[in-house]
């Protein structure tokens, strides 16, 4: 029996009513019992199920609430921007190894930026990636601030939901990529007992075991805990690379009454090996080598002793207190420490590639051999990043006449420090690799020849303070959302080798305005304007860090979220522009200059529906028309890794009657259109379609309620494809067929 969160005398009657209602209807409902003394009967009236929370689980694949777009618990149809939510229920259907894999059926999101590699969750949203190598990913509303190679990742098994907000978001979050962000919500303690153990085995010698335990620590539900963890070991797709991950997430909630909630959240993850993180040339992948052959999809151009490890530690809390019907205060806080270490040899294109024009090894080859010898470089890198973030909000609900307001005021602060101790090998620092007869050997990463390599020791510091205000004002069926934010963003880079320091302090105001019209039938058209800014970490030829880029977006859309059915259908048309993009110096120096512009226009459609207890459907379509509208070199071109068309469709069916009762069958397809492989648009990466499948059996039929066994297959027909390229020397094979058997037991 579920334990109540607070001790109230009337709960005993409610518990009796639940038992009676369950016996009568065969399904659990929340109920209230009324006993009339004149009659020897009990009248049971079913009450609505508890309302979904933006910070908690959703009952189906179609989540109806989100806090990512407003920082308040808001119905999705009331947010004047596009939001997609991948619930734990949907993740359970696919059992993804990474969060980016969990987003494979989400519109507007390119997840193939690194092909089969699971080292990072790098995404391109509406044609834009985060500045540099960093991700634009958040956990519980606070940014997982990364720097250089030091980006944190969260395992999807630890999450309640993963949400994509598309378009500029600086009005709430400060510095950000104009394309949007990923916000993940951690699993939190429950007052109902949860005991889950999971086992996985599959392709590439995958073995994983996980556990998820939660319960109240007292009869009144004041104290509760959750402990989630996993251990995973697998071979990466590329020969010689491995993936190892050990993670645990202890959480504890103190809820003294129904108006106060304090939840301690933590996450500890150790990855002795993060897998493959190299790249391959277009020759042998997109195009055949001179001998007419292509490289195998498990090809690894690195050294045999390549290593790449990461360690993450995060502790923090989420606190909220409702003073009365008007005022609620919330605060999210987290301290994180991330360490990465790598010794990596990586490819840098065949010798005939202009990128290797200064290589002496390549110059010594006969012209006929330059097309099948791969130039390589290396990096030795150790980093330690510390990040502190806190976001404090005051929510005020009140009315002015006929207008209901939800006013949010807040201030957030972020401080990041990343100490980089690296050594880079340049041209000719690693022997060439014959792609006709490749022999991977160990590499001496300690040699560090100053003739062709050098140190890179940098201490990067960043700070951001932002104050913001947002009003969600509703008059009858009209909802107006208006918000503004002012940021102070400071960055400092100390070059320990040269003994120089680069600094830049930026101040920026951004705002968003939107209007929604809420029809009674669940249809909600909307219009919005939003802005973003994103500081640069690069330095110009004058020695100064560049000014931030800025984003502006106009979006028109419609959402359909009926009150009585778990269906969410959204569609949007947008025009998004990024100004002050960096571009090549027209005077021919090796430095970039400011003043570039990229524009993206697009259409996105998404549908998520639990059409019945048996049928789930997820579908999406994306059209993205991205272009360098101002650039000294690439004007009129399309950015690399941005397909014009993407589409996906998934459906699953569960049998509840007959001999197949308890069986779930599912299948889906993901289409990615062709994309350009470099900013010069000198070649294209072909389109591809992959098919996924699911077979799952509910063990309740054999007396094990809540448990199941399943077989998940991604890329069912083992389609060979190049996921994307960012340049002529940087292409990525897509994931091969993955077959994973899963056994989940609840007791």
UniProtKB/Swiss-Prot annotation:
Residue numbers on the Periplasmic membrane side: 34-192, 216-222, 256-259, 322-326, 397-404, 474-477, 518-522, 561-565, 611-613, 655-661, 699-705, 747
Protein name: Ferrichrome outer membrane transporter/phage receptor
Gene encoding the protein: fhuA
Organism domain of life: Bacteria
CC terms in the record's Gene Ontology section: cell outer membrane; membrane; transmembrane transporter complex
Site for Interaction with phage T5 RBP-pb5, residues: 566
Motif, TonB box: chain positions: 40-47
Topological relation to the membrane, as annotated: Multi-pass membrane protein
Positions in the Extracellular compartment: 202-206, 232-245, 269-312, 336-387, 414-464, 487-508, 532-551, 575-601, 623-645, 671-689, 715-737
